[in-house]
């Protein structure tokens, strides 16, 4: 089970100097602040400051009462002026920066734009640099060549299905599939990047996180969350999608020869029956599946088993054959396998014994179709497009520009190679020094806070401080396996990944095989603790509990998160809270089960654990009362238990970032050393108020109702509005900054706090 926690975001750059002078802004004086006021009366009027101020003012609605609805106050202008792209379920600063970074990658790989970089003569290995750029451009060209993709028809997918199911017999003795045949089929799926109802993956061993071991998890659902299988409308759409895709792939008439889109009427009863049986099987899988809350619990999901023990629990699968089938030649599993849910295996054994072989075959066929169908030409993938669009609230008639899809393929398949050029053209090295300074100040704030927490006993306090000291920062881009700054290292790293300029389907299949082989080849080897999990252009930040690392790719070090030229109160409200969020993950309901090196064991005393649980329950209750509107105007409650870790991280991150910034401000009351100057048009706001406004802007977001429902069912994060309002409700510093009366919406008497 993957235990990496993610967090993302980004911002747009506006012009128009005249817009800085907005409509009259209410004067909000800070009350009760113990820190010094900003004595530096200088207003920065550089182009960067003017742009930053304009962006903040554009997003705000100063007529709104910040004490009643802070998200409306900080983001009301954003809600009014911004629109969701026709092909997206939401619009926010994640999307803004994602698009901005993708534009940069497109200029690298799209020859038609005439902006591609020329490998520098100063590159130590110009031949490698040239080969790398060629590889990127070949992959992109294969993806953009839709006529060649269409002319290949459905044959590539049919060949893949035939290969995977070559050993599968539907004429099993006694109505049960041979366990070795099933194991080999599951191994084939895994080797090509697909996970069926069980999946094996390699990662740090929970009890010895310096070494990689095998983990066994559940999966195999085609809908985003279990709840969708109880929604009749969605189930009907899903059955229709499966039936249409079977018709597309196996029908007698090739859909590319038709002049119309395939409809329900075109689908034979045979395919409809298959679809209903496949959905029925998945519905059973969903019913025995582990709840998201328990899957995220590192104690409940840490169940070491020998191969013999697993074989006894689920004898319908030949486990030695499955395991040997996914491991490279010469690699053997020598450690216990970590099972995420023994109860799921028990339920799966019952389900497999009650499922006829033909249904199982059709289910596996559907797995291959749903995973690889998007790599076919447009007519063949249309039913899949309609399903995914509908679940996000996007019109199925909307078509995403092909280049956007192809850039996403570059980022996925050759991300670090593209990242080499990204950091050369779009990443100022000065960002690293400044952001590391911010992170260190927040770590220092935590170190100062821990001893003041009366519920944290001496033994647990000692372990917490040790873990904080051992926390590792990974910044910008990987320098190991591969070194993103080195053309030679990148060429070597991707040397075994073939790329064709003319065969997009083969490229996708080869990448799946290559990435799986790279992962399984690490079994029993030391964990690479220097590699970032994603390429540098990624707009994310991470905390990895099994390595005790906080990770900040270059892609997130942009406005509204961070800008070297922005005042500290803006950077701490943006990037500082992000950094504090990731640090807090080390001590949330999941992270606190891992020690300083990432080992799972109980280093908390029972007394401290009980106190933590009581404090955590406050967050569960608070966020569980928040709602979002569904597509028909119905209320859907946020799952306070499912989002607990992220909510603790949001609240702790805001508090510690604010305290770290205040400490710096107190050490530099002139505001000169740490750039706490004023911004044009925002002079009426105090630095503390602008800190909180900067925080909220990170979460300004417009969403379609269907998208929101999807997220609260499948995501561990709260909806964006509640990541703003829910957090400031718990902040005395916010209430003081905006003079919110006790009992007002944003300053309730009862507040939740862990860290």
Positions of predicted regions on the chain:
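Hydrophobic/aromatic-rich, well-ordered segments within soluble, folded domains that form packed cores
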Residues: 59-81, 227-247, 456, 644, ...
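Fungal secretory targeting signals
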Residues: 1-26
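Noncatalytic, helix-rich "gating/capping" subdomain that lines the substrate-entry/channel surface
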Residues: 106-441, 478, 499
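Short, Gly/Pro- and small/polar-rich lid/capping loops
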Residues: 35-58
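Short, solvent-exposed loop/turn and secondary-structure capping segments
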Residues: 56, 81-85, 108, 225-227, ...
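Intrinsically disordered, low-complexity linker/terminal regions across diverse proteins
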Residues: 23, 38, 47, 312-316, ...
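Active-site-surrounding "flap" and adjacent substrate/cofactor-binding loops of secreted or lumenal enzymes
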Residues: 44-49, 64-69, 73-151
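Fungal extracellular Ser/Thr-rich, low-complexity intrinsically disordered regions
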Residues: 22-37
